């Protein structure tokens, strides 16, 4: 959430920066709400001043033994007006809050201008895509002999799900363990196990609500045995997490952290659940875009002056997984028009997918600035001992399913077997090759 003082101070400058990312700020709507708020506050202050003045008169009249009933009646009337004014102010403040919650973050000045992913800027590329001397198979065909089953998953749950058994399930598990071990043992993250179901306050804190509710899986929780209709206001909405970023970042919601406790660095392996509401017809084959997928998430909670240094470090941490797996990748900085809602700057890491003959996103690393912290009221005590908003960062380290796809396709052999990357062999009992079932 943006600082409302930024809008009050120079809304045109904020609107111009937001326009760079394709968002049109409702300047007139904000101005109208601000004018209404000011009018109500002015009227409230006038009523309070009048009530205070009359209260003094009552004291003086009573001190003289004179009748104060008329003045007391006027004070009572003012009290009713103040209650009505407070209610009006609550409504306007609520509308202002709703507007603020719907506004995306302002891009950092270092972010390149652009309208779509076509204008993202490559910052580095590592590894050379392998030249195959046999017809390349995609991960769906390769995985069929290794225990990857989309048909039975469709029977169980519908489209965009997968069942993994045998060798491919072991490889999937090995990848997640390898990622966690690398981040905790080499990159300084603390491993965390977090809930996969969170409340609405947590989703608001990291920015999924209210704007992106259609992308989430909602889990209503009823009070007692009543139906949802009978329960009415007693139904509390919970949500399956779309990423472990949500519970990890919310660890500091409504907290004031000691300055010397920063930075905080967490890593968690979790399933992620997304409805993919806006992705109809995209990546319908295979594991690239699923309703349920595993991911190792990195979150850093830092002091403001260190957040961009932390972003660079986090991006290198994600890249390091691909380096160790010896997978070709490239890193791009997202342009203003391709950035996520809460980000002030984002790097995407894309891995080479041979069957598609292109690079596909496998990680996004973002600096959210104080955008999430303001929503969560997450603060730290600065050197002067005063509470100050934290900066939060998050990044995929990595998406396990997409990494599995990349390993299967880049390490495939002509006979349909898959060579296990050297970095993963300790997690598979030294096994060097995954062979398809006869």
From Swiss-Prot:
SUPFAM superfamilies (UniProt xref): Class II aaRS and biotin synthetases, tRNA-binding arm
Q: What class of enzyme is it?
A: ligase
Q: Which reaction does it catalyse?
A: tRNA(Ser) + L-serine + ATP = L-seryl-tRNA(Ser) + AMP + diphosphate + H(+); tRNA(Sec) + L-serine + ATP = L-seryl-tRNA(Sec) + AMP + diphosphate + H(+)
* Annotated positions binding L-serine: 243-245, 297, 396
- State the superkingdom: Bacteria
State the Gene Ontology BP annotations: selenocysteine biosynthetic process; seryl-tRNA aminoacylation
Residues annotated for ATP binding in this entry: 274-276, 361-364
Give its localization: Cytoplasm
- Protein keywords: Aminoacyl-tRNA synthetase, ATP-binding, Cytoplasm, Ligase, Nucleotide-binding, Protein biosynthesis
Query: Which positions, given as ranges, span the membrane?
Result: none
Entry EC no(s): 6.1.1.11
Please indicate if the UniProt record lists ATP-binding as a keyword.
Answer: yes
A cellular component term from Gene Ontology for this protein is: cytoplasm
Family annotation (Pfam families): Seryl_tRNA_N, tRNA-synt_2b
Give the pathway annotation. Answer: Aminoacyl-tRNA biosynthesis; selenocysteinyl-tRNA(Sec) biosynthesis; L-seryl-tRNA(Sec) from L-serine and tRNA(Sec): step 1/1
This entry's Gene Ontology molecular function terms read:
ATP binding; serine-tRNA ligase activity
**Similarity-based family:** Belongs to the class-II aminoacyl-tRNA synthetase family. Type-1 seryl-tRNA synthetase subfamily.
Query: What is the stated purpose of this protein?
Result: Catalyzes the attachment of serine to tRNA(Ser). Is also able to aminoacylate tRNA(Sec) with serine, to form the misacylated tRNA L-seryl-tRNA(Sec), which will be further converted into selenocysteinyl-tRNA(Sec).
Q: What is known of its domains?
A: Consists of two distinct domains, a catalytic core and a N-terminal extension that is involved in tRNA binding.
SUBUNIT field: Homodimer. The tRNA molecule binds across the dimer.
Q: What is this protein called?
A: Serine--tRNA ligase
Organism this protein belongs to: Ralstonia nicotianae (strain ATCC BAA-1114 / GMI1000) (Ralstonia solanacearum)
Tell me the classification of the organism that encodes this protein.
Bacteria, Pseudomonadati, Pseudomonadota, Betaproteobacteria, Burkholderiales
